[in-house]
Design a protein with these regions (language model features):
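N-terminal pre-Walker A segment at the start of P-loop NTPase domains
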Residues: 1-18
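Conserved lysine of the Walker
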Residues: 41
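P-loop (Walker A) phosphate-binding loop of NTP-binding proteins
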Residues: 36
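Hydrophobic anchor at the beta1->P-loop junction of P-loop NTPases
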Residues: 31-33
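Phosphate-binding P-loop
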Residues: 22-27
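Short phosphate-coordinating micro-motif centered on Lys-Gly-acidic
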Residues: 2-4, 85-90, 96-150
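Short beta-strand-centered segment that lines the nucleotide-binding/catalytic pocket of NTP-utilizing
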Residues: 55-69
Length: 150
């Protein structure tokens, strides 16, 4: 199953899809969350957090601080790079220790990583289908044959 495309009709359904996807994740995994503003990246992150036994109410987008850390079944590192002007700024939060650590890294606006982007990562692309519907496409670009289930 190289790529899965789904349509979500609500935030609750997006969180449920993310929760099912989270069952495929293991320590050291990096998940890129791509999409325009309001596409559902943080909602998807909340669904993963809930599946990792982190209260979804605690999860918010770390736009102004670059990263939040949540403790659950595994540590969850949630990056929001929207305001990042230079990938070198990530060194101030020692991002590589998190990316290659014992938890799961969720990265909103991953295109801002520039040359620091890890080769191995999941890609979750979210886009607006309508006001309430979202297209969700999940893949593992560096190994399209990596199997996962939803």
């Amino acid at each position: 199953m190289p790529e899965v495309s789904l349509i979500s009709d609500s935030e609750q359904e997006t969180m449920a899809i993310a929760g099912r996807f989270a069952k495929n994740l293991k320590a050291g995994d990096i998940v890129f969350l791509e999409g325009e503003l309001g596409a559902g990246k943080t909602v998807f992150a909340k669904g993963i957090a809930r599946a990792m036994e982190v209260s979804a109410r605690k999860v918010n987008s770390p736009t102004f601080i670059l990263m939040n850390v949540y403790q659950g079944k595994l540590p969850l590192y949630h990056f929001d790079l929207y305001r990042l002007e230079n990938p070198e700024e990530l060194k101030t939060v020692q991002f590589d220790e998190y990316f290659y650590g014992q938890g799961i890294s969720l990265v909103e606006w991953p295109e801002r990583l520039g040359g620091l982007s890890p080769k191995e990562h999941w890609l979750v692309a979210l886009s607006h289908k309508s006001e309430h519907q979202r297209n969700i496409c999940i893949s593992y670009p560096s190994n399209p044959q990596r199997k996962f289930s939803l």
